[in-house]
Amino acid sequence: MTNETFSDRLKLAMQAKQFKQVDLIRAAQRRGVKLGKSHVSQYVSGKTVPRSDILHFLADVLQVDPDWLLAKDSTVNYT
């Protein structure tokens, strides 16, 4: 899996839920998850991939399977 693939899938999931980067940050704040604007920007731009706990948070908020975000699964499974 490349950072680009994660980024592409993250953007697809965000579009499907009509989420902007700020929506992810606000959801994180509500749940007590440390997620800054720069982190989300790096994930969306493909510069980095989140650690496991953040990956699972993103998947939960966007209602997708974490393996799909990581491109371990080719079919999207909205939960």
Language-model regions: role of each:
Residues R30-P50:
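Recognition helix of helix-turn-helix/homeodomain-like DNA-binding domains
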